[in-house]
Amino acid sequence: MRIRSIQYLRAVAALLVVVAHALLHPLNYMDPTYARLGDYGVLLFFVISGFIMVFTTGRGTFPPRDFLYRRIERIVPLYWLVTIGVSILAVYAPFLLKNTRFTWGQLVQSLLFIPFYRENGDLVPLMKLGWSLNYEMFFYCLFAAMALLRATTRVLLLTCLFLLLTLIGALIDFQAAIPRFYTAHVVLTFCVGMGIALLYQRRSDLIRGPLMTALWAILGIMFTLLGFAQPHDVPITIWVEIPLTLASASFLLLGLNIERRLPNSRIGIALGDASYAMYLTHMYFVAAIIVVLHKLTGELLPLLVTLASIALSVLGALFVHRYIERPITRWLRRNLAPAKRSEPVAQPVSG
């Protein structure tokens, strides 16, 4: 079962990240408002991911092997291709990248979703946006480890585990990359999505009726404004992530509430399908636009760079999804899939 509102929200999340980088990349400084746009998109992806994992696996148990295979076949191939592409650029065209420097050790860690520090202190892989996929894979592995539990028990245990990790991270200032990364409070966003999925499975009154439609719309707007109203000297921390996560949850609940009244937009569905490709590949297109426009005009006009980057990123993602991502996924399902399969698990939502 495909939920249209989820597809549309996935498209919105990817576009938020694209717009943020299209605005940021030409600048020589970090604009906090633009950066928060990108973080908003990722937080929305994480909330959707938590929802999708619970929704697609149902109320009971599920085969963990099939679940993990489907997660790997959808996430790994394109991410590996993009990571290898970034590595090639770092070696042969480093001027296209701001802070990325290639080492074999970092390539291996990136491909295996192992967090590490870069030379500049950033806790991100070679393909910077892969940090979110490190969290996704961590979530998937823990979710699969509880496959033999019923959905409610699974969600409660995972929520307790993530709360414990967050508490440990708050009490201990880890310096090592792995414990510092996985005890960050951002992991709690998955719990928000999982909780909404439980409500949806039980046909909760929170997900029906005109009153709830108005409530979730108002809360979504209010929390969004609150997240962006934080002073610019406040970094992307819990004080920004809390309202933006609540805004993401509100818009997810709004979408589920009006699902039957939503138009069946082919463009919206297509962009939702291509959202993972858009998330992973858009920086290639943004960099290409900047290089081409700089050579053609001798200067970078911010508005032109932004609009051209967004347009090319969307078109490029649709192309990559149709002619690279989907064929690879089909081939893997035909040739390497486990003999016995569970119900299909939806596409990755964080990329």
What are these regions (language model features)?
Residues 40, 54, 75-137, 141, ...:
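Membrane-interface helix-loop-helix regions
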Residues 7, 11-14, 42-43, 49, ...:
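Residues within membrane-spanning alpha-helices of integral membrane proteins
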Residues 349-351:
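Long, low-complexity, intrinsically disordered cytosolic termini of multi-pass membrane proteins
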Residues 50, 140-147:
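Alpha-helical scaffold elements that line and support the substrate/ligand-binding pocket
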Residues 72:
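Active-site helix-to-loop segments that bind/position phosphate- or nucleotide-bearing substrates
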Residues 1-8, 12-36, 54-66, 116-122, ...:
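Alpha-helical transmembrane segments in multi-pass integral membrane proteins
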Residues 69:
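Phosphate-coordinating loops and pocket residues in cytosolic domains that bind phosphorylated ligands
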